[in-house]
Every structure is written in C-alpha cells, then in structure tokens.
Design a protein with these regions (language model features):
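Extracellular/periplasmic carbohydrate-active domains that bind, remodel
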Residues: 1-166
Length: 166
C-alpha cells in the first residue's frame, strides 16, 4: 500500500536493483519478443525491475500514493522534441509474471524510464483508477503491457506515455 501523500521513489543508483538471475537465464519470458538495438551491448532483455513478483496470488498495489520511476537517470541527449533514452539497460518499473488475482488500483505511477507495468501470463487482473504520467518525450515508456494474460480488466485509467498506452 502506497498511502495518499506518500511517494515510493525508485533509486537513482542502478546498483540498488536486484539482478534477477532467472530472467537472465530465460532472457526474459519465452513468450515475449525482445527488441533489437543497433550499436549497443544491451540485448533488449530486462533483468532488473523496481517492483517484481512471479508465481504469486493476491498481489495488490494500491493506496492513493505515487510510485516514481526516477526517469532522469536514464536521459541520453535531450532535444527539443525527444529524449533519446540511450542509456541501457533502463530499469522497467513493474513486472508481474504468472500471478493470479492481481490488483493495481488508485495509484499514480510516474516518470518511468522504460516499460511502466508489464504483466506476463497473469490471470484475474484488475487495474482501475490508475494514473500513469510518463514523460511523453521518453522513448519506450509504455503504460500497461499485458502479455498473454487471461481475465484482465483495465478501467477508469488515465495513461500518458510516449509509446504504447496499453
């Protein structure tokens, strides 16, 4: 629970993020196609997240507060019309894999440097009353990315992102 008035802020020190060895072994999820990056050592497979859960039941993110992704640490060149976000790997905010009865409700999620909410193979998902406020000049800061989910309902959300909103 992120209570009203509270801000859960992602660390600006990349060493603070747990390296998820299971993601490294799988690359990511076998169901997800990863992007290709030219002239970059990064292979497009995120291995660290700010908030991560796998194979859990009843996860709930709620409370009226703010989750802040600290996007500024990923800025590459800032131009008038775009931030290139050339720093890789950028840490996505939330990954839920194969979770059931997942609820994300009445929170504001802002300043994601990459994917904001990535749900992979989840079932019985309720997302409502969520505000996603990403910098519209930051590439790939998708709002909500459901991959192979079942019985998912997204309602009453406001999503501002430079890439896919849903």
């Amino acid at each position: 629970v992120v209570e009203t008035g509270a801000v859960l802020k992602a660390s600006e020190d990349l060493n603070d993020y747990q390296y998820i060895s299971e993601l490294a072994k799988r690359g990511h999820d076998h169901m997800v196609e990863v992007p290709t990056f030219v002239n970059c050592e990064y292979d497009g497979k995120p291995r660290q997240y700010f908030i991560y859960s796998r194979d859990t039941d009843g996860v709930r993110i709620s409370g009226g507060g703010v989750i802040d992704g600290s996007e500024e640490i990923y800025y590459g060149e800032v131009r008038e019309d775009q931030i290139d976000g050339a720093f890789y790997p950028r840490i996505p905010l939330i990954l839920m894999e194969h979770c059931t009865h997942l609820t994300i409700q009445n929170v504001t999620i802002r300043k994601s440097g990459f994917w904001t909410t990535h749900l992979v193979g989840c079932e019985e998902v309720e997302i409502s009353g969520v505000r996603i406020l990403n910098n519209r000049m930051m590439a790939n800061c998708d709002g909500i990315d459901p991959d192979h989910c079942k019985n998912e309902r997204i309602s009453n959300c406001h999503i501002g992102a430079a890439d896919d909103c849903i």
